A protein has these predicted regions:
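Donor nucleotide-sugar binding/catalytic pocket of nucleotide-sugar-dependent glycosyltransferases
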Residues: 143-184, 190-191
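Conserved donor-binding/catalytic core segment of Leloir-type glycosyltransferases
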Residues: 188-217, 230
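Nucleotide-activated donor-binding/catalytic signature segment of Leloir-type glycosyltransferases, i.e.
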Residues: 239-259
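Short alpha-helical donor nucleotide-sugar binding micro-motif in glycosyltransferases
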Residues: 258-259, 266-271
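Aromatic "clamp/platform" in nucleotide-sugar-dependent glycosyltransferases that forms part
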Residues: 279
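Short hydrophobic beta-strand element within catalytic cores of glycosyltransferases
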Residues: 296-300, 310
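Conserved acidic donor-binding segment of nucleotide-sugar-dependent glycosyltransferases
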Residues: 312-313, 317-324, 331-338
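A charged, aromatic-enriched C-terminal amphipathic alpha-helix characteristic of glycosyltransferases
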Residues: 326, 339-369
């Protein structure tokens, strides 16, 4: 007989860190997803097996984008209102929003049955232009929810602005991973740390054109001392970025395509630093993965992970996404100054707890236990 679970986690589809969160709750939770995969994560999701005994999928054989909207809304609504769990935590991100009509009306009905409906929230004031009318509408559609588990301080401030000032809110816990998932791989951490690494989707938001031009200038400046550059990921602009690397005559750039988490961990373990120059990044979960393997980071100031788990000159460098000289200098220092690099490596230890699923469990315990 299956143990009764008191918590339900809801998301559009499952990623490896979704399973990390589920496992962190020690058998007290189920996870419900809408589809087996979704854009823009399909390549990553298809590159590895993502499963768990407590994971349920409404459309187990379909991508989110293959499901007609009317059918999806009906099935999601019915799946939610039939749930027995006392605490239901609605994810935010990908293709799911707590103010989508199927989610919203299900939340209202669940509240009538005295369910404790919470949300996970990782957006903030700065991720896009805001409209007063839309913001007012959001405050209405967020009324059924009794609390929020947020990614960081800016997300917590934003949700409070949207009507959660008197509700339970955490400013930690959303974007977390199980660090042991990276430590358990069958390889030793490479002590040489002899290349730079980018991990992410190949699209304009990630600012790869800028990064390749920065890398070209870095190579011109350092000559034979310049480190190779590896890029992991797929996406609509991949071929254009490969062509740009050829046009810039970058012989030490390697595009690895989509990789499994085990392969990413192996690449991270040998990286001198992880580079994330994104024009905007809601979080950047790969920063957590870098912390797992004690890898310093150079991140754009618009990567929201830097609010909580990156500190300037402690475990990384924070640079404007259009500051070419700043990026070149940062890469140069990390390349040639072994003492500084060692200091950054040691600094990653400070952020292991906050970036790990222990932080997620702590946030859930706070919201579930203390919310009536």
């Amino acid at each position: 007989m299956k143990k009764h679970k008191d918590i339900l986690l809801v998301s559009a589809s499952a990623m490896p860190y979704t399973i990390d969160r589920l496992k962190s709750l020690n058998g007290n939770a189920n996870c419900l997803t809408i589809a087996k995969c979704e854009n823009p994560y399909i390549e990553i999701q298809n590159a590895q097996l993502i499963t768990h005994d407590d994971l349920e999928i409404i459309f187990p054989d379909k991508s989110f984008d293959e499901i007609s909207r009317p059918l999806r809304m009906v099935k999601v609504f019915l799946a939610l209102v039939r749930r027995k769990e006392r605490n239901i935590i609605i994810g935010m991100g990908g293709n799911i929003r707590p103010f989508h009509l199927d989610i919203f009306f299900a939340a209202i009905i669940l509240r009538l049955f005295r369910k404790n409906i919470l949300i996970m929230f990782n957006t903030n004031f700065l991720d896009r232009e805001r409209s007063l009318i839309i913001e007012l509408a959001k405050t209405f559609f967020l009324l059924p929810y009794k609390g929020a588990l947020c990614s960081g301080p800016s997300a917590a401030a934003y949700i409070k602005f949207l009507g959660f000032k008197k509700k339970k809110v955490t400013n930690y816990g959303f974007n977390t991973i199980n660090h042991l998932r990276f430590k358990d791989s069958n390889h030793q951490v490479n002590a040489e740390k002899n290349y730079f690494l980018f991990v992410g989707r190949m699209d304009s938001k990630k600012n790869i054109i800028f990064l390749l031009n920065v890398y070209a200038e870095y190579c011109n400046k350092l000559g034979k001392l310049a480190l190779p550059f590896h890029l992991i990921g797929d996406g609509p602009e991949l071929e254009n970025y490969k062509k740009l690397a050829q046009d810039l005559d970058l012989h030490s750039v390697f595009f690895a395509g989509t990789q499994s988490d085990i392969a990413i961990a192996k690449e991270l373990s040998g990286a001198r630093a992880l580079l994330i120059p994104s024009i905007y990044e809601e979080w950047g979960i790969v920063v957590n993965e870098a912390i797992s393997l004690s890898v310093p980071v150079i991140v754009s100031e618009h990567v929201r992970a830097r609010e909580a788990i990156v500190r300037q000159f402690v475990n990384g460098l924070i640079v404007e996404p259009n500051n070419q000289e700043g990026w070149i200098k940062s890469m140069e220092i990390i390349t040639i100054d072994d003492g500084f690099h060692k200091k950054l490596v040691e600094g990653t230890r400070r952020f292991k707890k906050l970036s790990g699923v222990e932080s997620f469990k702590k946030a859930v315990d706070y919201l579930v236990v203390n919310t009536n």
